[in-house]
Structure formats: structure tokens, C-alpha cells
Amino acid sequence: MPINCKAKCGKAAALKRPKTGDALCKECFFAAFEAEIHHTITSSKLFRRGEKVAVAASGGKDSTVLAHVMKLLNERHDYGLELVLLSIDEGITGYRDDSLETVKQNRDDYKMPLKILSYEELYGWTMDRIVSQIGRSNNCTFCGVFRRQALDRGARLLCVDSIATGHNADDIAETVLMNVLRGDTARLRRCTDIRTGGGEDSIPRVKPLKYSYEKEIVMYAHYKKLVYFSTECVFAPNAYRGHARAFLKDLEKVRPSVIMDIIYSGEQLRFKDTAKNPVRGTCNRCGFISSQQPCKACVLLEGLNRGLPKLGIGKKSKGDRMIAKQDQELALRERANLVKNDF
């Protein structure tokens, strides 16, 4: 016997919402999913009329659903926003080159301007080349740092007021767990914030999908027949986040509400008044936001260019010793060449 839609629309239920357990027809699920995102946007005052917003587009399910819903809600509720797509090409053969085709399809489907920036043009390196130097153990460190700054660079080029990212509830819960396990109180303080950055020297980032479950995003994309790229990054299996994700999935089996529980716990965390956070400023080399001098992106890039790819991995003191040692070796080499030329 078919189950009726809980919204009492008279239709048979087509699915069960992972977030609430409600049996709904497709149309009522769409309405509920979109209404929740609209509530998140309006209650958190993420945007103001007349603003230009860059939607971070990767071609994956999250960014595709974000672009679709942002366009839909902007028109339905008259937000008055100018929406553009911003995509970063990390230079990963067999992954990003294919996903960018999906991003271009999103551009055509949603009639949004698209800007693509590559690591190669920004840093002179692709992730494929970086991995050939560093190996697969720390590649996500490079990619994450470069990608965050690349989005800032792209946003500045586009002169946008904010960047909307596709981080969903699962992503945020995983990040809370990762920061707890690593003892990273600085990131733990801000990882549940729906808006980060902002101020004179940085463009704020917002997370309209903060309370949207990954499973529901997949269901929405599936039933809406949205075009998205579903292949996982070829370097992702070695990421530390994967362990947090697996742990979260195990917890979800025994406590279905654990994703929202972790997010709410992260939002309510209190820290000692004596706990110190790094002061966020701007990098004295590249001019982009940073809590260290020089910024992590500049340190990693310097290491690559010096032939010391592990320069930015680990403590700063270790990196300083590596630079000092290399400079000393270069000086000795130059001195030896001068002596040789004298003869």
C-alpha cells in the first residue's frame, strides 16, 4: 500500500527525507529543501540587495545544486543579486579537466557568467606537477591552501561582494571533528560560522547549504535531473578528511541526528578568555589574508620554486632551517665557482 505524502498534498510519497524522516512526494521535497535554504539565507542575512555574488563552482553536486537554488531563489524571492560562477582549475588530469565541462554546462543552463582561474596561471604550477614533487601524502595541503587563495584572487578580479560556497552540513560536521582531533582551536572557533572573512582586506564567504544534508543534496540533484560531475578527485583517498567522514558515517548509523548535533555543539563551544588566536592580517608578499608572515600559500610556493617541496609542511622553524641550509649550500657553491674561475 503506497504511503501518502506527509505534507498532505494528496500525492503518494516518493522518498523519505534523511534529515527529518518525513515521507514526501518529489514536489513537496523540492519545496521543503528550497524553503530551508531560503530561511538560512534570510535568517542569517547572508546577502543584501544589489550585491554581486560569486558562486564557487566545481561541477560537483554541491556547487551545482547551490548554483541552481541560488538562481531559483534569487528570482523567486527577488533578492536582487548579480550572480556569477567562479571556478578554479587545479590542473588534475582526468578529474578537473572533465569537471570543468560540467561547469561550462552550468554556465549555459543557468545563464551565469563564468570565470575560470588555473593554478598554472596563478602560481606557475599544476597539482599534477606538485604531486610529482611532493608525493601523495601531503598533496591536499597544497591544494587546499592554493584553492582558498585562488578563490580570493578570483573574487577580487570579479569585484564581488561575497563568495557563496557549497559546504553542506556533512562537510561542516566533518570539519568540527577534524579540528577537535587535531586540537586546532583557532579553526574550531570559526569552522561552524556561516559567514567567514570580510573586513577591509578580504571578501566574505558564506555557506547557504550549511544545514543541508549531503544525502538530500544528492536526492535533489537526482530528482531535478541536474547535470553534475560525480567522480572523486584522484588524490582524495589519501586525505585526512576521509577518516573523519568514515567516522561520521559510523556515528550516523547509531544516531541519525549526529550531523546536526555536531554542528550545534560546534556553534555553542566556549573557549577560555586566555586562549589566544593568531591575528589575521594580510601577507606582506602577496597581500592576501593570512594569520602568518608570509602566508602559507607563499611559503608552499617558495618551497616548490626552491626545489624544497616540504618547506611549508610542519613547523615554521623547520622550514627556516631548510632555507638556511639551502642558502648556505648555494653560497658555498658560488664561492667554489669563483675560486675555480680565478685559476
UniProtKB/Swiss-Prot annotation:
Entry's family note: Belongs to the TtcA family. CTU1/NCS6/ATPBD3 subfamily.
Keywords tagged on the record: Cytoplasm, RNA-binding, Transferase, tRNA processing, tRNA-binding
Record-listed E.C. numbers: 2.7.7.-
Ranges in coiled-coil conformation: none
Pfam families linked to this entry: ATP_bind_3, zn-ribbon_14
Pathway: tRNA modification; 5-methoxycarbonylmethyl-2-thiouridine-tRNA biosynthesis
InterPro entries documented for this protein: CTU1-like_ATP-bd (IPR056369), CTU1_C (IPR032442), Ncs6/Tuc1/Ctu1 (IPR000541), Rossmann-like_a/b/a_fold (IPR014729), TilS/TtcA_N (IPR011063), tRNA_thiolation_TtcA_Ctu1 (IPR035107), UPF0021_CS (IPR020554)
CDD domains cross-referenced by the UniProt entry: CTU1-like
Enzyme class, UniProt record, top EC level: transferase
UniProt name for this protein: Cytoplasmic tRNA 2-thiolation protein 1
Compartmental location: Cytoplasm
GO MF annotation, one: nucleotidyltransferase activity
Disulfide bridge positions per record: none
Main localization, broad class: cytoplasm
Described function: Plays a central role in 2-thiolation of mcm(5)S(2)U at tRNA wobble positions of tRNA(Lys), tRNA(Glu) and tRNA(Gln). Directly binds tRNAs and probably acts by catalyzing adenylation of tRNAs, an intermediate required for 2-thiolation. It is unclear whether it acts as a sulfurtransferase that transfers sulfur from thiocarboxylated URM1 onto the uridine of tRNAs at wobble position.
GO BP annotations, alphabetical order: protein urmylation; tRNA thio-modification; tRNA wobble position uridine thiolation; tRNA wobble uridine modification
One GO cellular component term noted in the UniProt record for this chain: cytosol
